Amino acid sequence: MKLILENVEKSFDEKQVIKGASFEFESGNIYGLLGRNGAGKTTLFNVINEDLTLDSGSVKLSDEGGERAIDSDDIGYVLSTPIVPDFLTGRELIKFFKDINMKKIPDMKSEDEYFDMVDIAVEDRDRLIKDYSHGMKNKMMMLLTIISNPAIWLLDEPLTSFDVVVADEMKELLKKLKRDRLIIFSTHIMELALSLCDKIVLLKDGKLRLLEQGEMSREEFEAYIIKVLKDETEGE
């Protein structure tokens, strides 16, 4: 399966943020989307998720049936600021999400099995979500994505609110889940991108570009990425 972006453009008033971006993302990979602050990473995610309308270009999915438009069921979008219903308990939310996704998930697990996947403590599972920490709410967002099982995951800096141990646990979980899925992970933390992602994609000057490590060491590759991000004339 591929997510195909062709000449995608998006502007706000007089400012063009995405400038003819084209790229093919393939399933089975975790892509690290890097870019400087204001580069348009969240805008790109919102365009893919159809929260924003394209000015021009196309976003398509290519699978065994050929190319087609993206359906809302294809995408799971985890925002940097979690949006979850505070008036429910964690268990109530998981049960509700299981119920509405029952038909498309053949191997549905119990609520506690899902909680175990993201290491939410037993004593927190029946608490109101309004009493959860920011990191716990982010865990719930990740869990809802796991349950709904979309083909494409858009993760907008979801690990930045976790402590070091939990972030490492979530990284290992994502690595296990990437098979048959396409995960695009937006972050500004270089170490996180290099330790988690299979491929690094830069969003710079409104366009997407794959950076390949080749024979470079990790330190050399990191220095190269920083150089490209800083160099306003690179590739022009």
Stretches with model-predicted labels:
Residues G57-D71, L210-E212:
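Conserved ABC transporter NBD signature motif
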Residues N49:
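Helix-to-loop junction immediately C-terminal to a conserved catalytic motif
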Residues W153-E157, F162:
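Catalytic Walker B motif of ABC-type/P-loop ATPase nucleotide-binding domains
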Residues L3-L5, I18, S72:
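Conserved structural motif at the start of ABC-family nucleotide-binding domains
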Residues V164-V166:
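Helix N-cap at the start of a conserved alpha-helix in ABC-type nucleotide-binding domains
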Residues Y31-R36:
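The feature captures the beta-strand-to-loop junction immediately N-terminal to the Walker
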